[in-house]
Amino acid sequence: MKTCFIDSKDSHHFVHSFPCVLAIGFFDGVHRGHQKVIQTAVKIAQEKNLKVGVMTFSPHPREVIGKEKVERLSTFSQKEALIREFGVDYLYVVAFNRNVQRLPPELFVKDYILRLQAKHVVVGFDFTYGAFGKGNVHRLREDGGYSFDVTVIDKIEHSKLKVSSTFIRKSLGEGKLERVTSCLGYHYKTIGFLHYIDESKLVFNNHQNMLPKSGEYEAIVKYGDYSFHTNIYCENFLNNVYVSHFHFFPVPSKEEPIEIQWLHRISANTLQPFEPFIVNL
């Protein structure tokens, strides 16, 4: 998969694009609903003998439109890796700024979708685009001058509630990891890096992933070639995660990412009766 960063409507990536089936969305967490969109695009591309493209945005549109910080379910590298697993040929990352925000819907389609040579577009049922979100799935084909087909993916539900990144963030905030895992289709993961060492405590820093509700969790901790299954203690309000049993492994370097796979919540306890391995996320 080739990742292409498009920072303006004059990007050279438009010149070097290929006719494709294009899946569009922010895809934070690449949850089951997102997976259905991408899988459908891949299937259609195979049937039509076309390339598969995925268009996403950076930063999150809400951070530009509403100037609000959106807690991420996945870092960009995590999202990129998850999308790559579906056999996508091109990941197009559009720099979402005020100029993109203000584009009328038909101009967004012309300047981005058509210039990427989309022959078929796949989106979720609630996809919107263009200034004030006026563009929607009902007018997408018309805005493209009927030059591409459109497939709209209906909502995926969990216990009769729509699976969405917002719903997953809410579930994380409630510590409902089983629900999170069901909606994602995999165990939620966060990434941290070594910040400093204090006696037997290792402190890690990361501000890109959302932490679940404070409490005790069963988890798998990975770094380098090492992996261990343990209980961890999360203090959400301090952005701290305490992990035990690290002393059997070498201390990771400051450049080495520490991955935590969150399996399930054990209790509301955040007290650590041991010398902890601390990850500040």
Go through the PLM ranges and name each one:
Residues Q78-Y92:
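A glycine-rich helix N-cap at a beta->alpha junction
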Residues V70-K79, L103-F108:
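Glycine-rich, highly charged phosphate/nucleotide-binding loops
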Residues H12-T75:
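N-terminal catalytic cores of NTP/NDP-binding nucleotidyl/phosphoryl-transfer enzymes
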Residues K2-H12, Y92:
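Short acidic-hydrophobic, aromatic-tinged amphipathic segments that line or gate anion-handling sites
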Residues N49-G53, Y90, H120, D149:
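Residues at the starts of beta-strands that form the adenosine-phosphate
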Residues H31, I83, V121, V180, ...:
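Residue-level signal for inorganic ion chemistry
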Residues Y196-L281:
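Phosphate/ribose-recognition catalytic cores of enzymes acting on nucleotide-derived substrates
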Residues R102-N205, N269-L281:
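Classical nucleotidyltransferase
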